[in-house]
Amino acid sequence: MIISIANKDVMLKILGEVMKMNVLKIFLEPLHWPSRMNVFKMHNVYIVPYRMKLNQFIETIESCMLALASVISINPEKIRGSEWSTMLYLMSGISNRQLAYMLKTSEKTLSGRVNNLAIKLGLVGFNKALQLRAMNLFYLIYTLNKPAEKRNYFMKQQKAILESVKKWFAIV
C-alpha cells in the first residue's frame, strides 16, 4: 500500500484504517519530508523521502520488500514517556526556555531529552524544527498502532499538554 497525501489529517486517518487491515507493508510519502532523508521503518510503515523519481521510488519499494534496503528501523517501545511528552510540549509552540520555566527543570535537561529522542529515531544532523516534525509523525504512527483505549489515552494526553501550555501562556 502506498500513501502520498498532502493533508496530514487525511493521511493519518487513511493510515489508521489501512493499519487495521493488516497490510504487509505500507509506504508513506509525507509532504513536508526532506528528499535527502533515509527510509525509516516503524512497525510495518515505511516512510520514504518526498518527491522521489518514479524509477527510484520503485527501486526503493522493491529493496524494502526484499529486505535489502538500508532502512532505519525504529522501536518506539524503547522511547521513554518523558521524551515523547517533551516533544509534544515543544510541538505546541512553547520554547525550550519557557518550557523549562513551566516544568521547573533546566533547559539542558529538556535539550537532552530531545537529543536522546532524535538519536533513537535516527534524526541526528537535522535542524530542530525538522526533527520535531519528524518526531511528531513517528509519535502519531506509534499511537495509531495501539488499541483504541490506549489511542484515546494518548489523544487525551496531547490535549492536556496543549491546554496546560495555553493556561501557562495566559498566566504569563
What does each model-identified segment do?
Residues 119-172:
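Basic, Lys/Arg-enriched C-terminal extension of HTH/homeodomain DNA-binding domains
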Residues 67-74, 123:
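Charged, solvent-exposed alpha-helical segments that act as regulatory interaction surfaces
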Residues 60, 113-116:
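Residues within the DNA-recognition helix of helix-turn-helix
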Residues 50-61, 78-84, 140-148:
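A broadly tuned preference for mixed-charge, low-complexity surface segments
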Residues 1-69:
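N-terminal regulatory/sensing modules of transcriptional regulators
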Residues 72-113:
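Helix-turn-helix DNA-binding segment
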